[in-house]
Regions:
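Gly/Ser/Thr-enriched, mixed-charge loops and adjacent short helices
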Residues: 4-12, 26, 34, 121-269
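Short, glycine-/Ser/Thr-/acidic-enriched flexible segments
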Residues: 23-25, 30, 62, 115-117, ...
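N-terminal small/polar loop signature for handling phosphorylated ligands or for N-terminal nucleophile
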Residues: 45, 56-123, 225-287
Length: 314
């Protein structure tokens, strides 16, 4: 295995100030030399006890996702992170990342997503840090990351042979192990523990129809795994279910404008009883009933009012 390389940079990138939703810039900006690496280095410098810890890394599948994960692996090896957990094909929704961080006792997770922003070479890219509690980094941490990014003169990286991310397995590089996992299993298992999927499936197979728009983003495989494989619903209950680097030209923002086909099916044609859509990384949704739009606050209120019906919340 090669030695750790210390790559020097001339000047900091003055626009690397993240919010709680991370750092979002154009894809082209993230592809500039050293831009991603310096920001990851700043994140690592802001994490206490990084060496020997567990880190989760994944993304929403937008353009540049795989390449970014490979660079992050090399930086993790240089920093002697103990274990890096990566989903197959690099696909991991934000809710699934949150669950995996807590389940594995990870120090945090790096999510490669610009959320509901468009993808592709002409679109946007993003990096956000979730901490050990599974939630987004607090402002105090993101401020520290920015301050660090402005003072860094170099970053560490180790050139290693990156395994194919489409194959499950465990690979060792010095003090670091790379574990490529089934990114769907843990989250679908969690859903089975929280909800009675059999009961919901029986209900949906009677006189209540469902359609879900994944907007060609990360939630498509989750929806097919849960709705089709586990609950036995028809395959076409999921539309735009294949993650694409540019989201198939769609803007993955689940609203009446960008999910207009779904809205037409529910609000105009009234072809289904229930419809929903999610954004790029799966942490934002839109819910529609037959002929009606459901405000996000109302959907949360409905769940809260009926927690006694949800096994995981009893």
């Amino acid at each position: 295995m090669s030695e750790v390389n210390v790559i020097n940079i001339k000047n900091p990138f003055v626009d690397q100030k993240p919010g709680t939703s991370g750092l979002r810039k154009s894809t082209l900006r993230f592809q500039e030399e050293h831009y991603l690496e310096i920001f990851i280095e700043a994140i690592f410098k802001s994490i206490n006890n990084l060496r020997g810890s567990t880190l989760v890394v994944g993304g929403d599948g937008r353009y540049g996702n795989i390449e970014a994960i490979k660079k992050i692996i090399q930086i993790c090896v240089a920093h002697k992170v103990g274990k890096v957990i990566i989903p197959k094909n690099g696909l991991l929704s934000t809710p699934a990342t949150s669950h995996l961080i807590r389940k594995e006792g990870a120090i945090g997770g790096i999510i490669l997503s610009a959320s509901h922003n468009p993808g592709g070479i002409e679109g946007d890219f993003g990096v956000k840090l979730n901490t050990a509690n599974g939630g987004p980094a607090a402002e105090s941490i993101t401020n520290q990351i920015f301050q660090c990014s402005q003072s860094l003169k170099s970053y560490k990286i180790r050139n290693v042979n990156i395994p194919d991310l489409d194959k499950l397995g465990i690979y060792s590089f010095g003090e670091t192990s790379i574990e490529i996992i089934d990114g769907l299993k843990d989250y679908s298992d969690l859903m089975e523990n929280i909800f009675d999927l059999d009961q919901i499936s029986d209900f949906l197979k009677k006189d209540f129809s469902l359609i879900f728009d994944a907007m060609n983003a990360v939630t498509g495989p989750y929806a097919k795994n849960i709705f089709v494989e586990k609950m036995g619903l028809v395959d076409d209950c999921v539309m735009n279910g294949i993650p694409l680097e540019d989201f198939g030209g769609l803007h993955p923002d689940p609203n009446l404008t960008y999910a207009s086909k779904l809205a037409d099916l529910l609000l105009v044609k009234k072809a289904y009883s229930f419809g929903a859509a999610c954004d790029g990384d799966g942490d934002r949704n839109m819910i529609l009933g037959q002929g009606c739009f459901v405000n996000p606050s109302d959907s949360l209120a409905v769940i809260t009012a009926n927690t006694n019906c949800v096994p995981g919340y009893k």
